[in-house]
From Swiss-Prot:
A Gene Ontology BP annotation from the UniProt entry: apoptotic process
Primary site of residence: nucleus
Pfam family, one: RRM_1
The keyword Cytoplasm is annotated on this UniProt entry: yes
Species: Mus musculus
Modified residues (N6-acetyllysine): K139
Protein name per UniProt: Nucleolysin TIAR
UniProt GO cellular component terms: cytolytic granule; cytoplasm; cytoplasmic stress granule; nucleus
InterPro entries linked to this entry: Nucleotide-bd_a/b_plait_sf, RBD_domain_sf, RRM_dom, RRM_dom_euk, TIAR_RRM1, TIAR_RRM2, TIAR_RRM3
Gene: Tial1
Length: 392
């Protein structure tokens, strides 16, 4: 039972006492909002079928206790009832309340659909916001803003899937650079990638935490050092790798030394980049990321910087997010592809195109401690072609 806008209005209520009646349920739930109906089920469920009398799946019901479906007139009332009644005791039993599911509401297979990456999202933008923004371009099969699983906050990007390729192409062309909330968004194709094998060096390093990294340098520092790329280091490669984490102000690469500096518009974007990119494989090399040098003028020109004082590493951060993490939709996806592109929780990577060259420069954090060991590239990752942050 869905409204025209697709928002659910029906709740599953389980673990009921056999003394509970439809009248009692309606009396209790109607205190929260007007109820349209209540259907009590007392028969033993078959876990593989749909109850034909109500049209809802009983897959979520695994006991022999009675259960029921309560339908509201308004989605907001159903949502309020879910929050208020789940875990409450009715006639001595703690009831379980959840959204009722129908066969049509089960997760759709969108692997053959056309997926659009949407970046630079404002923190307040929700899944419904991007779905509404892209709806004029055609029928959408899925849309979601990617969230941090620990904090529940938006990671600043999302994905929209279309049934039709032409609709997706038009959305990319016409929505790129448009304002959504307080920011201009970026759009591009999103692509699925095979999982990359772990290297020994990656397996033996430690994963960083955003809360730790963001506090390791002052809020004014927006510069990331990325080193360890012995070959293939280019401005385009760094832009592809780091652009999903926020607006990039400047990039400076030093191919002969195997490192680069990337300056973001915000401290938080830089911290997310360090956490996510550090320890990943780029161009066949496991990279190290940490904060660039703090100076009174964070936009100091590169030509004024003496890089000879930074021939040592200040610290070695640990490993990236685990490769091949199993996701709920059955895909095994690494957080990064061979060329360092991030992967979202649905297994999509980001195909980023190079943008215009950036001007200016910035300093780097003076390393402390021992000089870095010589870079020894891991074995080539054969079989992989060139690669192209509590979703809602």
């Amino acid at each position: 039972m869905m409204e025209d806008d697709g928002q659910p209005r029906t709740l599953y209520v389980g673990n009921l006492s056999r003394d509970v009646t439809e009248v009692l349920i309606l009396q209790l739930f109607s205190q929260i909002g007007p109820c349209k109906s209540c259907k009590m089920i007392t028969e033993q469920p078959d876990s593989r079928r749909v109850n034909s009398s109500v049209g809802f799946s009983v897959l979520q019901h695994t006991s022999n206790d009675p259960y029921c479906f309560v339908e509201f007139y308004e989605h907001r009332d159903a949502a309020a009832a879910l929050a208020a009644m789940n875990g409450r005791k009715i006639l001595g039993k703690e009831v379980k309340v959840n959204w009722a599911t129908t066969p049509s509401s089960q997760k759709k297979d969108t692997s053959n659909h056309f997926h659009v990456f949407v970046g630079d999202l404002s923190p307040e933008i929700t899944t419904e916001d991007i779905k509404s923004a892209f709806a004029p371009f055609g029928k959408i099969s899925d849309a979601r803003v990617v969230k941090d699983m620990a904090t529940g906050k938006s990671k600043g990007y999302g994905f929209v899937s279309f049934y039709n390729k032409l609709d997706a192409e038009n959305a990319i062309v016409h929505m790129g650079g448009q304002w959504l909330g307080g920011r201009q968004i970026r759009t591009n194709w999103a692509t699925r990638k095979p999982p990359a094998p772990k290297s020994t060096q990656e397996t033996n390093t430690k994963q960083l935490r955003f809360e730790d990294v963001v506090n390791q340098s002052s809020p004014k520092n927006c510069t990331v050092y990325c080193g360890g790329i012995a070959s293939g280091l280019t401005d385009q490669l760094m832009r592809q790798t780091f652009s999903p984490f926020g607006q990039i102000m400047e990039i400076r690469v030093f191919p002969e030394k195997g490192y680069s500096f990337v300056r973001f518009s915000t401290h938080e974007s830089a911290a997310h980049a360090i956490v996510s990119v550090n320890g990943t494989t780029i161009e066949g090399h496991v990279v190290k990321c940490y904060w660039g040098k703090e100076s009174p003028d964070m936009t100091k020109n590169f030509q004024q910087v003496d890089y000879s004082q930074w021939g040592q590493w200040s610290q070695v951060y640990g490993n990236p997010q685990q490769y091949g993490q199993y996701m709920a939709n059955g895909w095994q996806v690494p957080p990064y592809g061979v060329y360092g592109q991030p992967w979202n929780q649905q297994g999509f990577g980001v195909d980023q195109s190079p943008s215009a060259a950036w001007m200016g420069g910035f300093g780097a954090q003076p390393p402390q401690g021992q000089a870095p060991p010589p870079v020894i590239p891991p074995p080539n990752q054969a079989g992989y072609g060139m690669a192209s942050f509590p979703t809602q």
